[in-house]
Amino acid sequence: MIKMRFPTLWRKWITECVGTAIASVLVNGSPTDEFPLGKGLRQGDPLSPFLFLLAVEGFRVLMEAFAANNLFIGYTVGCHDPVVVSHLQFADDTIILCEKSWANIRAMRATLLLFEDLSGLKVNFSQSLLVGININGSWLVEAATVLNCKVGTIPFIYLGCLLVGILVAWFFGSLL
């Protein structure tokens, strides 16, 4: 939050909210004495989504830096006024879009590992998928091995929605 220029007072408030929680449990229907909880966010904490957004902002900055230095080439969307999209994020779900190249695979791995080191968050590679459109299966397997993830196929689930045929064809039409 310092690097994002949050005022000292805001940082103190957030630290106070995150670090001073107490709890009590019911034992045989009677509450115990209150005890302090460990530091950090707890499941269901209303601040969690907002603090997570601050944390993953670092990923956006890393992706932007890799793209600005031509180390990562995102996917071009549109014909008349094309836009290059490198990633989409919502809450703790991220989809990374790129053209097929070993340079992109290496940059993707470097970005994700660097993000882990800088943020303290962990990327769940075992639940991550590499999905290709009109890309040779053996290339995908090799690339997924480098990324330490699984190969996915269309349809796949993103944000709880099954992305199938017409949606994927609409979004990725120029690759089909």
Which residues make up each language-model segment?
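Nucleotidyl polymerases of mobile genetic elements and RNA viruses
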Residues: 1-176
